Amino acid sequence: MTNPKKIEMVNDFQQQFAKKMNELGFTYSNIDLYQQAFSHSSFINDFNMDRLAHNERLEFLGDAVLELTVSRYLFDKHPDLPEGNLTKMRATIVCEPSLVIFANKIELNQLILLGKGEEKTGGRTRPSLVSDAFEAFVGALYLDQGLDVVWQFAEKVIFPYVEDDELVGVVDFKTQFQEYVHSQNRGDVTYRLIKEEGPAHHRLFTSEVILENEAVATGQGKTKKESEQKAAESAYSKLKSNNNL
């Protein structure tokens, strides 16, 4: 038997999503894709839905689509910049704090389907959750409308911020740490997930950053990417203060 609360939430989402897409000037075909894009695992768990009905797979796809789209934009806009500079700029644009800025600009967080507990604990404004939903939406848009429409979306929501230099204060610690290590003529930097714990709707990830085959710092976060950023921030701070790991 279908849960009345679930029906109410889904119907409300579909109405609000249609309104949002109209505001943005885009059409869509497969509403199920977008519903999945905005379905947090806590919502799926609350209503005992298929365990893969949440947005994490679309987030994975959207992450890659965003990187490609931003890479093409930077490649065309800066024909004289070397690869290293382009990589740094891309990292700043697609990192979590920037994605939250883009998502908040168009209030995408209001569309996210959350479980009761996640809603009560402020999940709707949690940066990692909002950035994940933004990536998942991009993944759904790509599958539903294609790369050209993703580009048009980026022209409205992402590129204006880049062109106005509004992301100057955004820090991508992985890039910052990598650059500092390179300036010190140190070895390769890699990241490894060492722990994943907690219920599906409230996971906690722990990652470590490895420099020259030695683990030098760890970080925790609600997502793997967030834990890597925290590890990089810790390692960078340690390296800067000691100038020797």
UniProtKB/Swiss-Prot annotation:
The keyword Metal-binding applies. Residues 17-146 form the RNase III domain. The active site is at 63, 135. One of its GO terms (cellular component) is cytoplasm. It is found in: Cytoplasm. It holds the Pfam family Ribonucleas_3_3. One of its GO terms (biological process) is rRNA processing. It comes from the Bacteria. Homodimer. Digests double-stranded RNA. Involved in the processing of primary rRNA transcript to yield the immediate precursors to the large and small rRNAs (23S and 16S). Processes some mRNAs, and tRNAs when they are encoded in the rRNA operon. Processes pre-crRNA and tracrRNA of type II CRISPR loci if present in the organism. This is Ribonuclease 3. The gene is rnc.
